[in-house]
Every structure is written in C-alpha cells, then in structure tokens.
Amino acid sequence: MAKSGKKYMQAISKIDKLKSYSIDDAISLLKEIKFVKFDETIDVSINLNLKKNHTVRDTVVLPNQFMKEKRILVFAKGDRAQEAKEAGAAYVGDDDLINKVKGGFSDFDIVVATPDMMKDVGKLGPILGKRGLMPNPKTQTITNDLKGTIAGLKKGRTEFRANKNGVLNFSVGKSSMDNKKIKENYDEFIKELLKRRPSDLKGTFVDSVYISSTMGPSVKIDFV
C-alpha cells in the first residue's frame, strides 16, 4: 500500500490542479502518469447544474467499443420472442423466464421487454430495480422493435444517468486504446449528454468535467 501510495502522489504531482486541460492533453497526461500494469478504464465524471425535478438519463452508442459484450435478457411472446432469439438475445421468454428470475436467476446484464409484457415484468421490480435493470422507455428497453434494440445493445449502446446530486459518471475507453479513439468516444458521449439539457434550466448545464483512470488521479477538462 505504501508503494502504491507513493506512486499515486507522484502521479498527482504531475497534474497542475489550477489548470483545465484540453481533452487531448488530459488523455495524454493520464497515460503519462499511469502507474499500474493492468488495462485501466478511462472514466469521465461530470457535475451538472440540475434542479430536484430534473432527470438526465439516456443512452449512447460509442464509436469505439471497449467493453465485453453484455448478456441480453428479453421478455417477449410469440413472434416477438422469435425475433429476439434471431437478433441474438441470450435469454428469451415470458412467464417461464419471469419465474426463473424470481427464483434467483441473475446471469444477465441488460433486460428488454415488449410493452405487453410490462404488467408481469413490473412484478420483478424489487429484483430488477435493485440492479438498475428494470426496462424503461427512456433507455429504449421497452419496445416492439426488438431487432433494432438488440442490435444497438450489441454495438454497445450504454445508458448514462445523473444521480440525485447531479453527478454523472461514464466510461469512455481503456488506457490501451489509441488516444484518438478515446477522444471520439468522449465527444460522442458529450454530444448526446448536451441533448438532455432540461428545457427549463437557466444558466450553465455542465458545471465541471473531470477525467481519470481506474487507479489514477483526476484531471479537470476545459469544458466550454
């Protein structure tokens, strides 16, 4: 721990805490001060100026994928169920699958449902809600377009959501990735985030933006 602490402090010493860096310089700096051997995730932390009634939640497909493919579970019947299977969902079913999840099955990362299934799927609220997996129209996981939705999820469609304090954390890459690809992911995420600015919000939407690696210190981004 002492050795890691020393390396962390050495990394911090290379960051000008009074300076806001361009995204290009920030990514380069994160790689320069990296002190662990494993492939760290590059994360963005954003402080938003939100009122209590504001919700910022959506999804984005990043141009450069870096996460392992997620296991998709779909609640659907009949032709829709067949469509989901053909689209590549890992698990597809209706009442049988609902009962399986009730019984403790949890080997999945994303849940999608057709609108007609939501009355029964809603009963799984205590289970799915706890994991943040309850289907929701805002994240396009309640849909009849299963083919399109599953295709998007397989391409890496990822949800972003601000918490009650207006803080939004999102991963944009891995330290092993080319700097340009990390920046492209960052730019795409920011573009989609800005579309979610509440219509009645006055003043600044984004208060501050920081970028960091899994084990490293954060670097402030010059966000205009």
From Swiss-Prot:
Keywords: Repressor, Ribonucleoprotein, Ribosomal protein, RNA-binding, rRNA-binding, Translation regulation, tRNA-binding. GO terms for cellular component: large ribosomal subunit. InterPro entries: Ribosom_uL1_bac-type (IPR005878), Ribosomal_uL1 (IPR002143), Ribosomal_uL1-like (IPR023674), Ribosomal_uL1/biogenesis (IPR028364), Ribosomal_uL1_3-a/b-sand (IPR016095), Ribosomal_uL1_CS (IPR023673). GO terms for molecular function: rRNA binding; structural constituent of ribosome; tRNA binding. GO terms for biological process: regulation of translation; translation. PROSITE patterns: RIBOSOMAL_L1. It holds the Pfam family Ribosomal_L1. NCBIfam families: rplA_bact (TIGR01169). Part of the 50S ribosomal subunit. PANTHER family: 54S RIBOSOMAL PROTEIN L1, MITOCHONDRIAL (PTHR36427), LARGE RIBOSOMAL SUBUNIT PROTEIN UL1M (PTHR36427:SF3). Belongs to the universal ribosomal protein uL1 family. Binds directly to 23S rRNA. The L1 stalk is quite mobile in the ribosome, and is involved in E site tRNA release. Protein L1 is also a translational repressor protein, it controls the translation of the L11 operon by binding to its mRNA. This is Large ribosomal subunit protein uL1. It comes from Borrelia hermsii (strain HS1 / DAH).
